[in-house]
């Protein structure tokens, strides 16, 4: 049934997307500033519905990957390696020095804490998707670090009791006969040099002995669309740990001095766009933070750590390329450095400017001089998606109609590749139908929504409670499953819970399993029975329908729902 459901949903939604595309509504860009009301909302939904809904082109993946990587390397090669702020015009030099002074104040109490944070993603040595850090620690090939990052990474492991133990045990296993003499020699060497922490000195050598030294970042890609891939880099494992640790310290300085907390600032930006301030969008921002400019902009106490933790070489297809940018996505501190850099520039034109990565919000009168200034420093402003005037604003994936003072609900409709994705896609369309009042886009979505009802089983029908998009229920107001009666015990116990327990009864068809081996079974099943001494529960070919009672909100069976609140 899963394959049939998948094919049906793909066909139904594909037809709807093509109908929406035929309307010829403008794509997301400068024209949106002139739209308002239902016309604006329809154009936004149409853009997001059509831009990403396409069957994955597997045949062209190699060519697309090569083209994307070459474009990335060309961008890197075009960045300047020499920067002197004295070459800037006087007004621009004043803004640059103001940004440097602002950063010096924000980072005045920056001190590395060497805290540990779990890295994610592939390392410089690929593990084919096995990115769990505990898994990496069990593999010799994943113990990688650049030579300059060894002291920083070793300090992180030294200050974490569990990592410290792992390193010591690994060192003992690698040098079972000499580890004690080697560690004692390093410790005595530190004592002779009167170092502050001889134990750390000895541990650093032990840590380096456990690792392979890798001085490059591996270039790879992740799918974006059928025209272009997103290029990222894969770092040595312990470089990733050190980069994330440094990023957390930078975030803490930013939070203490400005009140901007990266952890939840995306949600703040989604609210700030309703103020009507200008929103500035950049193209390829993470790849245009020039390293020579960063060295002149940030305090030396930060730059010296950046120098040690970033790799100065890219590796791709056996060739090596110097890194002229700070670091692309894939490096642990790229996003935080991007936020600090652009925020420092924006604050020179608007003291109330805000930044989250490359999403900038500032006053309308400050937008033009800000964009002119950053373009002189190598940044590329996406003018088609930058909104200074008009009724439309966009930031961090949120869209606002200033004329009606409301956020516009919209979704990216993506090609489903499994049954769970079908449910999510269907629920997106369900919510879009409810949020639109009228218009040709709504008419198309309504027809699509009605056809989807025949695709999903009625037992999956459920009311939309306004929560997350569900991947096992289809949101509809039609009756599907029957409401199950609650026993007296459930009613009493659920009264002590934070919410009342509502039950729904759904039918499920399953094969009836036999409990005994028959004489007419084949030889393979008989051999299995003789070896095991019991039946494997071989299906008899008959199907039996059973009713399963589940919690209406969570989908859990009643036995899995805690009915008593300890609070």
Where are these regions (language model features)?
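A short, surface-exposed helix-loop junction/capping segment
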Residues: 223-230, 319-325
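Active-site-proximal segment of RNA-dependent polymerases
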Residues: 227-280
